[in-house]
Every structure is written in C-alpha cells, then in structure tokens.
C-alpha cells in the first residue's frame, strides 16, 4: 500500500492560512482519487519533534560505545526513541507533502527540526568513498508554500530559501521528483488576496487528482 506523509508546518488552520487551505484542498482531492492509499498527517505543531541537543548526542554516544538502551537516562531514551520512530516512518513512506508558509524568507523552525530528525545516515542517505548518496530514490514529494510577496520571479527570487532548502535536502536524500505548488502575493496585493487564495485552492484540488 502506498503511504503518504502529509506534513504541515503552520500553527493556524485553513481558515487563516493560505498554505493550509491549499493543503487541505490537495489532500482531500488526493484521498478521493486514491482511496486505497494510507495518508498520515504529521502536524509539526502538535507532535513531539526532539531537537538534536546534548541529551540526544549523549544518548547516541552511549549506544555507539556499546551500551544498552537501558543505560540511557529516561529523557535520553524518550528523545532517541522518538527520533528513531520519525526517521523510520519517513524512510518507509512513498510520498511526502510539505505544507509551509514562508516566514522570514524560509519556513518555521519546526520544519527544520523535523528535517533534522529524519536526516539519518543509513535511512535517508549513506556515506560512500565517493561521498554521500541518497537512499530515497523511489519517492516523490510535493511542496505547498504560501508567500505574502512575489518570490517566484523578479528581484526577490533569490531571497526565497524555504522551498529551495527543501528541494536541496530532498535531492540529497535521493528523492527524484519534487514538485511545487506556490500561492504568493496576497500581502503585496491585498486587493487580490481572496482571488489568490481561491486560485491556489483550485490548483491544489486539481493536482490532488494526478499527483
């Protein structure tokens, strides 16, 4: 069975967020077109994503030195186990849908925390004599992003770092197909805000039927 991770990185719902509105439209359309696929929603604002901190490094260090899992402190066990769950889930999935806003030219910190959690050697990529090689070569991804300004073209295009980072890291993981659906300009052109949102929702619904 095809497994899809629907990963949302916005604290607001579709009534407030353009990216979440488009994401909801996409995933509902996708489910209707693919009723036999398993869709798992990962709300990054409502799930435990451990930061890679000293306790995590200490826990990993104990395991690498040959100590058993029981040698880790309770907090180390919780964090290390959760990171293993997240990275295993990511590696086992077939498709990834990232729904994010553009904040300060990038994305919310919870998105980077999630990427750090799943970017595990031996699962997402491996090291070879020639360098790192991605392992997720049979996957597919979609990036749904909303931007208040226009960053797809023009003088601000080089300032967009969120989707560019996700494109790069997913490519590093070996993902061969990464598509984008962008909703932009609603703050720059407030008189067209509703039209921009509605267009994004329509495009998302259409893409859900073919992705």
UniProtKB/Swiss-Prot annotation:
FMN binds at residues 17-19, 102-105, 146-149. It catalyses: 2 a quinone + NADH + H(+) = 2 a 1,4-benzosemiquinone + NAD(+); N,N-dimethyl-1,4-phenylenediamine + anthranilate + 2 NAD(+) = 2-(4-dimethylaminophenyl)diazenylbenzoate + 2 NADH + 2 H(+). It comes from the Bacteria. It is an enzyme of class 1 (oxidoreductase). Keywords: Flavoprotein, FMN, NAD, Oxidoreductase. Pfam families: Flavodoxin_2. Binds 1 FMN per subunit. Gene3D superfamilies: 3.40.50.360. Its EC number is 1.6.5.-, 1.7.1.17. InterPro entries: Flavodoxin_fold, Flavoprotein-like_sf, FMN-dep_NADH:Q_OxRdtase_AzoR1, NADH:quinone_OxRdtase_FMN_depd. GO terms for molecular function: electron transfer activity; FMN binding; oxidoreductase activity, acting on NAD(P)H as acceptor; oxidoreductase activity, acting on NAD(P)H, quinone or similar compound as acceptor. SUPFAM superfamilies: Flavoproteins. Homodimer. This is FMN-dependent NADH:quinone oxidoreductase. The lineage of its organism: Bacteria, Bacillati, Bacillota, Bacilli, Bacillales. The gene is azoR.
């Amino acid at each position: 069975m095809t497994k899809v991770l629907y990963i949302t990185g916005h604290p607001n719902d579709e009534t407030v967020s353009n990216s979440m509105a488009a994401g909801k439209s996409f995933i509902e359309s996708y489910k209707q077109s693919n009723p036999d696929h398993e869709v798992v929603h990962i709300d990054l604002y409502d799930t435990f994503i451990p930061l890679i901190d000293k306790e995590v490094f200490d826990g990993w260090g104990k395991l690498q030195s040959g100590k058993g899992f029981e040698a880790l402190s309770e907090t180390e066990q919780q964090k290390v186990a959760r990171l293993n769950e997240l990275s295993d889930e990511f590696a086992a999935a077939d498709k990834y849908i990232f729904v994010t806003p553009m904040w300060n030219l990038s994305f919310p910190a919870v998105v980077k925390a999630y990427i750090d959690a799943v970017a595990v050697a031996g699962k997402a990529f491996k090291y070879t004599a020639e360098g790192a090689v991605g392992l997720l070569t049979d996957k597919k991804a979609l990036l749904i992003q909303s931007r208040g300004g226009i960053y797809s073209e023009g003088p601000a295009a080089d300032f967009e770092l969120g989707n560019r980072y996700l494109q790069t890291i997913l490519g590093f993981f070996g993902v061969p197909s990464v598509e984008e659906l962008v909703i932009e300009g609603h703050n720059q052109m407030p008189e067209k805000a509703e039209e921009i949102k509605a267009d994004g929702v329509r495009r998302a619904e259409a893409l859900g039927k073919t992705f």
